């Protein structure tokens, strides 16, 4: 009987894992010759979208498989699935392709180019999900 209960519990957990939306990596053209890499988690029927802006230097260096070279411990980055679990399309943005080396976003967050990159991200979300878009930043991410 106990083995059967364990089997049922394991099966239920596997279905729960399958039900979670899988993250995808999107490279969005934002400026001539520049792309914005984003990790996107899209739940079924999102209520809104959140753009998560990590603090620090902002160079997450998201790999094509969705892993990070830096920032995995950042509060927003590590909480990304919690946002998606609440029905929010969740987007973790990296530094753009022309800022993938130190100093990454240092001194860049206040520029017109950064605004252009974020505007392109917001426009893509509004077109893709057709939901309200919220920007969420911590520490230096709030400068964006």
How would you name each of these model-derived features?
Residues 43-88:
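Short, surface-exposed "cap/lid" segments of acyl-processing enzymes
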């Amino acid at each position: 009987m106990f083995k059967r209960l364990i089997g049922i519990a394991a099966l239920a957990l596997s279905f729960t894992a399958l039900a979670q939306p899988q993250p995808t990596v999107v490279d969005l053209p934002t400026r001539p010759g520049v792309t914005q890499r984003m990790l996107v988690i899209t739940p079924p029927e999102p209520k809104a979208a959140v753009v998560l802006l990590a603090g620090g230097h902002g160079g997450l260096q998201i790999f094509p498989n969705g892993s990070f070279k830096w920032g995995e411990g950042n509060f927003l980055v590590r909480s990304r699935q919690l946002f998606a679990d609440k029905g929010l399309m969740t987007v973790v943005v990296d530094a753009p392709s022309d800022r993938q080396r130190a100093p990454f976003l240092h001194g860049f967050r206040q520029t017109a180019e950064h605004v252009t990159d974020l505007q392109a991200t917001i426009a893509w979300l509004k077109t893709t999900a057709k939901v309200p878009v919220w920007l969420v930043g911590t520490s230096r991410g709030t400068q964006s």
